[in-house]
Amino acid sequence: MPITTDVSSVRAVLFDIDDTLVDTRGAFRHALAVVGERHLPGPVDADALVATWRADVNGWYRAFARGELGYREQRMRRANELHALYGGPVMDDAAYDAWDAEFEAAFREGWVAHVDAVPLLDALDLAGVAYGAVSNAHVAYQRDKLDRAGLERVPMLVGVDTFGVGKPDPRVFLEGARLLGAEPASAAYVGDELDIDARAAVAAGLACGVWVDRPQTRRDGHAGGGDASSLGDGVVRVERLADVAAALGL
């Protein structure tokens, strides 16, 4: 679907990281398979585990991004909900700490870039377009993730610890543009969630929001918290990063 606003002035691109540049779904699948084998009864269906984890039906991670929960608290709640659904034991603080150490080690093993990430960065470099990352996780954590995934060239600009909140708060988008030396109206945002990425970027005053809607990867089968039947002005849907440059007219 074409963008209904002029993108000819786009000179900077802000990126989400998880499930946009980095295959975080794959990393979660690996980590959940590891802890599932150790802590859940019976055969482990890694695809079911990762679908449940990413759906996060009670919205604990988004509560963290709004500054309402700590990082540890949101993950512990999600881990215990996963155990309740799949027959695992209720974890107290000590049990959760052991679980999380195993989970985090396996999660980090799985950090790899999507295959279309580097070619897009190459295209942006060739076009002279500045870029950087704005994420709903902590800056240092995401810097490590980008580096481990082979995306060292992507500046980590804004995280949830910058203002104490994350997307869709408009400040995070505006600060990302400012750090790239770009006016909001000359910046685009690229992310995998329709509501807190693409639409929120447009609402913050960016030129456009690009929703990367990879086939078979929506959280709980839905469009990242929004109705995808009408994307709204300034929002474009693509199925892969390889289509982003063309969508922005670069």
Regions found by a protein language model. Name each.
Residues 1-13, 118, 122-125, 129-250:
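Asp-based, Mg2+/Mn2+-dependent phosphohydrolase catalytic module
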Residues 7-115:
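N-terminal helical cap/lid subdomain that shapes the substrate entry/recognition surface
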